[in-house]
Amino acid sequence: YLSARRRELYVPGADYPFRNENKRITGKIHMLQYLSDAPKGVVVISHGFTESAAKYDEVAYYFLKEGYHVYIPEHCGHGRSYRLTADPFLVHIDTWRRYVRDFLKACRYIKKAHPDLPMDLFAHSMGGAIGGIAAVWEPDWFHKVILSSPMIRPLTGNVPWPAATGIALEKCILGKDEEYVAGKKPYDGGGSFETSSATSKPRYERYKNLRAEHKELQTWSPSYGWLWASAEMSWYLRLYGWKKYTAPMLLIQAQTEDLVSVRALKNFAGKINRQGKTT
């Protein structure tokens, strides 16, 4: 069913006006397209940290059965999209704006392909931060917005958030932004369902096996550049972004959150409900 409706696409990433010519890196965004037989709308999925479009086959299936075309662009440094580092296991970004601009470039392509259909956003974890900011920058593009465990603020383990962001900033200033965050390591094929944040063992095992077979899916750990970018996205959303939403929004919190701050998510939702322009 899925393979009959699936198509691989590549769209150019967004141009970003860096002052430093060495940072004017652009590439192609890889995207999976699933076309419904009787579409009533389009859903764009913004995936999470270290994930890929391949992880969302089941989600795409459910949206297809409900009558939606589905598009899943892969963020820079993930899957088959372009990367800023030669290390295949490292998730690295030079500026959070690159994520958002690339995502909106993909959305612009999708809107042109289906001008008469409403476009909805389903965004998870890191993709929730990226998609959440995209909906701030282009509020008229998205008919409805679903943020699933959005990374309003990432959790940083035993290191307090202020200390973690301070260390990340220092590393970036010293030109060490492509270093692995302390305690993180390259992909080694390890990991287990019991120590993961997954709740379905068959789903966990499926993607673990898929990742082992495909090098492009083996992104595993963050760089200090990524950590600093996540901090900047967090501040943007919490201090400014929440004021700008106009589309109806559904925020989803997991029963147990291991990777994102529940407190930050609840505060974000509270601000929107009390003073925002949407529900």
Short names for language-model regions:
Residues 247, 261-271:
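Short alpha-helix in the alpha/beta-hydrolase fold that links the catalytic acid
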Residues 126, 130-218:
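Alpha/beta-hydrolase-fold enzymes
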Residues 53, 60-86:
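Conserved alpha/beta-hydrolase
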Residues 270-279:
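Catalytic histidine neighborhood in serine/cysteine hydrolases
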Residues 48-51:
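Active-site glycine-rich loops that stabilize anionic/oxyanionic intermediates
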Residues 245, 251-253, 257:
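Short beta-strand/loop motif that positions the catalytic acidic residue
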Residues 91-111:
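Alpha/beta-hydrolase active-site loop
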Residues 1-35:
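N-terminal cap/lid segment of alpha/beta-hydrolase-fold proteins
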